[in-house]
């Protein structure tokens, strides 16, 4: 009996915690779909295509291809 009551209290607490810490989801889908549609029309607008902290062509990279934006490294980014 005590275990059942504790389980009920735990589930209620976790449910309340989920609602309290969740982002404001009002109009979430309404704002999500136009943004996704824009990225489908213009793939360059996608945030996934952007690499931050990479070196452009002509920069020294040693032998680490991950440092170059093009991921082609022969001592210098190509």
Curated annotation (Swiss-Prot):
GO cellular component: extracellular region; host cell presynaptic membrane
Superkingdom of this protein's organism: Eukaryota
Protein name, per record: Delta-conotoxin-like CVIE
Protein role: Delta-conotoxins bind to site 6 of voltage-gated sodium channels (Nav) and inhibit the inactivation process.
Residues annotated with 4-hydroxyproline modification: 65
Family label: Belongs to the conotoxin O1 superfamily.
Propeptide position ranges: 23-49
Molecular function in Gene Ontology: sodium channel inhibitor activity; toxin activity
Tissue specificity annotation: Expressed by the venom duct.
Matching InterPro entries: Conotoxin, Conotoxin_d-typ_CS
Subcellular location: Secreted
Note on domains (UniProt): The presence of a 'disulfide through disulfide knot' structurally defines this protein as a knottin.
Keywords: Cleavage on pair of basic residues, Disulfide bond, Hydroxylation, Ion channel impairing toxin, Knottin, Neurotoxin, Presynaptic neurotoxin, Secreted, Signal, Toxin, Voltage-gated sodium channel impairing toxin
Disulfide bond residue pairs: 54-69, 61-73, 68-77
Primary location class: secreted
Signal peptide: 1-22
């Amino acid at each position: 009996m005590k275990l059942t009551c504790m389980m009920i209290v735990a589930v209620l607490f976790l449910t309340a915690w989920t609602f309290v810490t969740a982002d404001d989801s009002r109009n979430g889908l309404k704002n999500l779909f136009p943004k996704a549609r824009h990225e489908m029309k213009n793939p360059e607008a996608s945030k996934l295509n952007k690499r931050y902290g990479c070196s452009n062509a002509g920069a020294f990279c040693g032998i680490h291809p991950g440092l170059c934006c093009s991921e082609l490294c022969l001592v210098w980014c190509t």
